[in-house]
Amino acid sequence: MIRNKLTVIFGFALFSALTCQGERLPLWPEGKIPNFQPQQIAATTKEVRQPGFKREEHTMPYLQWFDAPSEKNGACMLLISGGGYKNCCDWRWIEKVAKRFTDLGYVCVSLTYRTPRPEGLPIYQSGWQDGQRAVRLVRQSAKERGFDTEKIGLLGFSAGGHLTTLLGTSALTPAYEPVDKVDEIPCHGNLAIPIYVAYALTDGLTGPNTRGGDAVDAKLSDVFKFDAKTCPMALFHGGTDPYSPQGSTEIYRQLRKMKIPAEIHLFADRGHGFMGDPNKGEKGTAYDHWLDRVCEFLRQMNFDGRLGKPVDLMTRYASDDARGEYRKEPIWPNGRMQDAQPHQCQPYLEWHFPKERKTKAIQIIYSGGGYGNNNPEWFEVTPVRRYLNEKGMTVVTMKYRTPRPKGGLAKHTSAWQDLQRAIRMVRSQATKEELDPNRIGIMGSSAGGHLTLMGATSSKQKSSWAIDDLHKIPCNVQWAVAIYPAYVLTDGENGQNSQGGNPNDARIVSDFAFDLDTCPMLFIHGDADGYSPMGSIKCWEQLRRMGIQSDLHTLAKRGHCFQRNASPGTGSYTWMDRIWEFLNHKKFNQ
């Protein structure tokens, strides 16, 4: 039925040049702009600054089509500027994003909607009307411009991120009365990417969040309907943005409740307009390379039709060529292991020194295994240590005691004892190895991610009695990397999350003290993981409350062990670069 509607031929002259490239297309028939207000214009700040600009000549909102890609991939991206609904100011980033997308085969078009905010109406009303009309016109032009009517993506910044979210969640709610047959065309997007979305929470519906978006009464705005046409999303936000990142986490949570694939990327210490420098390469941070994450999301969703076959991670990092010296040592002195139990394995450390050392930092890594087993040769450990050795970093791998202890001890007690002692051992030997005892990080996956949270948040808590002078050395760390941590929330304390970790009463378990030595963290989690990514999100939110800025990335459609087999060009394939970007940003690897 949709395709039949798209064949309707319109008599308006403004629709006659749809097949041309690079032209400007007015949104409305002359005299039919809904809720027209003479004080509003439709122009970018670049246009407004041009000599001879006349407001009265710029009242018609419009689409601006970019030159078509040389090889189309069958999808279209509609780009939406921010500006507080007061202007359209993001034209520079619109142009940069359009160039990147065009190079990848996307047909690109930008929307310039009416600003400033309308009088007597919600601040978003004019933009929403123009946005719904714009999506209809884009869909109408699909056949002639060479893309699929059901492959229309939306990307917007700030207020444009708010408008992107509106269009992505509320297509079944009309923003205006129909003016012609164009309005019979559906106005839903097929994928949405809100960048530092503004006005998402009730403590900041028209400006920055008055209570940081974290108050008990700060709720997600009810303007977002999350109807049956709600599309997959990737959300991006800076951790110190006054337009609170909690808006993005709440949108993400709602999408999870609806089982709609989604990603969220949160950047430590970044405010509104977090963009960095994409030319920094491997010296860059996560926010420098945010557009790469957008492209990876599109690839993971197969929006470009080019999702390839998964590749085994171990085959990609099969060599120890970057490793120099290797050393293995037990964690406990003979006969002095705390709470020793005969059914458990013997814990040990392995030092992996790089051939060419480029940093004095040390990364401790260990695997998961449900506290039933663990192995430093598994895919959760070996590829990462090889990757970091290639970067010039010293890595220490740990085998902790498993299976779970008996006799009433918690599932993690033995492993926590081993980790605290391991950190002390590494710190005690760092200076001798010409490494920095105050630049030590820990990293674990799954149950090892739970153990990482223990080590990162609870170093002031004693896991065991002192048996020697090593116990006098602090066991805090400077950073932590939690990869799909398990057992984080109360609805999944001993297994997968029964409620998906989504409800408010699915709280962080009491295992984690979040004491005063808690360190910054990086979280990476599959969106489709049964050990819910909401555990990572809620821990990130708790760290933010404490003023501890951290990075977080979730990966659409990816489950537990997302990295084991991943398609090139996706976030599950490049995930280890997030570790290096985090260390770059925090300067731990210098």
Name what the model sees in each region.
Residues 22-71, 312-357:
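N-terminal cap/lid segment of alpha/beta-hydrolase-fold proteins
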Residues 74-82, 360-368:
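Short beta-strand element of the alpha/beta-hydrolase
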Residues 91-109, 377-396:
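Short amphipathic alpha-helix adjacent to the substrate-entry channel of hydrolases
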Residues 122-143, 289-292, 410-431, 575-577:
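Alpha/beta-hydrolase active-site loop
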Residues 133-228, 421-507, 513-516:
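Primarily recognizes the serine-hydrolase "nucleophile elbow" in alpha/beta-hydrolase
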Residues 235-237, 523-525:
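Short beta-strand/loop motif that positions the catalytic acidic residue
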Residues 242-248, 530-536:
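Conserved alpha/beta-hydrolase "acid-adjacent" motif
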Residues 249-312, 537-590:
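C-terminal catalytic histidine-bearing segment of alpha/beta-hydrolase fold enzymes
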